[in-house]
Amino acid sequence: MILYPNCKINLGLRVVRKREDGYHDLETIFVPIYGLHDELEVVPADTFSFEQEGIKVDCNPEDNLIIKCYSKFAKKYNLNSLISIRFKKNIPFGAGLGGGSSDAAHMAIALNELFELGLSKAQLAEEVKELGADCPFFIYNVPCYAEGIGDKLTPIDLDLKGTRILMIKPEEGVSTREAYSGITITGEGLGDLGKPGILGNLNKFTNDFEKTVFPLHPIIGEIKKRLLDAGAYYASMSGSGSTVFGFFKNNPEGSTDAKLRVLKEEFASMVLLDDTFGEWKA
């Protein structure tokens, strides 16, 4: 079977508190982006194999989240066959898009179907939580209000159908450690903003990491400014960066489109996606 692990963006991201275990409690809105995805093919086989192409995954095979997920399921559920995995990496690293977490979650979905494990989405989400804080979100893969370390999820009604999204990522990435290095914790979450009807309050959805990341990587802040100048009604860095996205009213005959063409030409090598939201894939 073939799956297409997609990425996500964050609408707002508040760092609420540092926990005793060293992690941080967050509040954010996760939004799936189906148009930018990796490719994952998993089939039963007599011998185990893993073939990877696309963007180079710079880690030992045993540290790859796809392999970790398979190892976890093979041991816990005594899977009765080995598998062959073909994987193409398209979602960049250090981008704030959750690509690795999505790969692990979709691997779990594949194993659940291939081996007829009968696990519910809630059970799958619990299984993948230890692989990455964002992993449970990709099991549901619809807009969610996220709390805790990103693992406490509440699906929300978010209508972005017809909205145009432009995603730009500079060559430089941002490590999670770097993003947290100078963060100021205010203790303020999203509050009522995280509830249905958020589109009218989008400009209040700020990303706390921007205050840390923009001074260290001025190009990221410049991209956000340029998106707004080009007519985006909302723009933000996603997660801990370095991807920045802008929402536009889909008006191809208007002046916004002319400004967007200029912007896309200037940042041509950095554009990850220019797409329009459709229906959510529940």
PLM-predicted stretches and their roles:
Residues 86-115, 133, 233-248:
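Glycine/serine-rich anion-binding loops at beta->alpha junctions
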Residues 11, 40, 66, 100, ...:
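Residue-level signal for inorganic ion chemistry
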Residues 2-5, 12-28, 117-234, 247-282:
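ATP-dependent small-molecule kinase catalytic core of the GHMP/sugar-kinase superfamily
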Residues 1-95, 113, 117-122, 157-161, ...:
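ATP-binding N-lobe of GHMP and related small-molecule kinases
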Residues 46-59, 107, 129, 198-206:
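Short, basic/glycine-rich phosphate-binding loops at helix/coil junctions
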